[in-house]
Amino acid sequence: MDWAEKYRPRHLNEMVGNREALHQMSEWATRWTVESPPLILYGKPGIGKTSSAWALAHDMNWEVVELNASDQRTKAVIEKVAGGSASTGSLTGAARKLIILDEADNLQGNADRGGARAIAEVIRQARQPLILIANDLYGLDGTIRNLCTKVQFKALPAKSLVPRLREICSREQLTCSAQALTDIAEQSGGDIRSAVTMLYASAIGKDTVGEDDVSISAKDSRASIFDLVAATLGYRQVPSLLDMSMSVDETPDTILQWIEGNLGVLPDRKKTAQAYAALSRADMYLGYTFLTQYYTLWRYATSVMLYGVHDVMKGRPSGYAKIMPPSRWRQMSVAKKQKTIREQLLSDMGTSMHMSASTVRNLYLCPISLLAKQFPEQFAKSYDLDVDKLDILIHDPATSKSIIKKIEDEKKQIEKELKKKKKEEDAKGKKARGSKKEKEPIVEETPSIDSFSSQEPGNPPEQPSTEPVEKDKKSSQSTLFSF
């Protein structure tokens, strides 16, 4: 059995590091109510996010329903699995049911179409604890981030990994040198899962593990696009920008857009022009690549863009700048989201008005918007609009938020009153049944057949009159031919 799974922590007090995050999770679980927002656990892979969620469920005696990247996560699947689980109780007798959505930032392509929207809807309607797990916090939809409490998991320092590795060696009766454990901890990059896997790979078929036995190459150390852009702009020193670009899981055209989107830090126009000249030349190579399908040109494009911009940045005072995704992407994302919301709104209104969405768009959208501005609350209630859909009609985000919040508060208040009324009715019914039971007269038991059979043959008991009974029997057994 793989040691990473064999020695997975079962309780929060067995977790290594991230004490602040674990304390935050424990406090959230202890004080959880239906109104509590879900948690987002985010950080590098392998630092204990999923294990801590399972350990929390074990400590709280909660049942677990998990949906990860290996499952299909379309809107229908999420609403069926997570949505149904989040709104119903446990069938196993557990106190509650914890919904874990692992790799929530990996909803991509047609396979996970509509998943992000479904997650947001599940969060709003959840009646059970919900935890989302992500490697990249900003890979999640903004709506989901705003609905959740964020808990950051940080990479573990090497010195905190060594005691855990030593404990595993002791349980496996394995002799391992201190230097070998230190090497494994340092090479893991704060990834405890990788460290345990490296120890397991080094110990296969051995009773003793030394420095020469350690499989240092077991961890694939990859750079992120943020590291590459920071190195290109001169914020960090690396041996080779080209080698670093090979370890980044992005294509050259994407790297070019990242660099271009962060050129606002350049000090003067002359240097800005020089940097854009390098990017322009690289873009020409990319164009030739797609035109000829000769992908060897990618290497030239990458070299020109990286070293061209890096050379311009020489002599600039070193410091720190926040590396951001290209602003164009954010604008495109907002436009795409607005278009999706608009099309959904038109479709819903067309269905309620018995006409097509295109007819609503071409003929009725303007008068509908005018009416919605005059009666926004009535429109929101009639068509069950959320903040985004109402904002499409009235073009006032602040008013839309206040109106939807007011409607949601009214719904919650009505729901509380109904629950309170139901509890009072149940209590009155229980009290009435109890008083009725006390007032019922004690009915003497009718002698049974066994009591007659227990009498002696010589002394037959005095039998009550059975004439009415016989009459009742005859009347109940009467047929069409009875006279």
Curated annotation (Swiss-Prot):
Family assignment from sequence similarity: Belongs to the activator 1 small subunits family. RfcL subfamily.
GO molecular function, one term: ATP binding
SUPFAM superfamilies for this protein: P-loop containing nucleoside triphosphate hydrolases
Protein name (database record): Replication factor C large subunit
The keyword Nucleotide-binding belongs to this UniProt entry's keyword annotation: yes
Region spans: Disordered: 417-483
Biased amino acid composition, Basic and acidic residues: 417-442
HAMAP family, A to Z: RfcL
Organism: Methanospirillum hungatei JF-1 (strain ATCC 27890 / DSM 864 / NBRC 100397 / JF-1)
Binding site residues for ATP: 43-50
CDD domains: AAA (cd00009), HLD_clamp_RFC (cd18140)
Function: Part of the RFC clamp loader complex which loads the PCNA sliding clamp onto DNA.
Domain of life: Archaea
Pfam families assigned to the protein according to its UniProt record, in alphabetical order: AAA, RCF1-5-like_lid
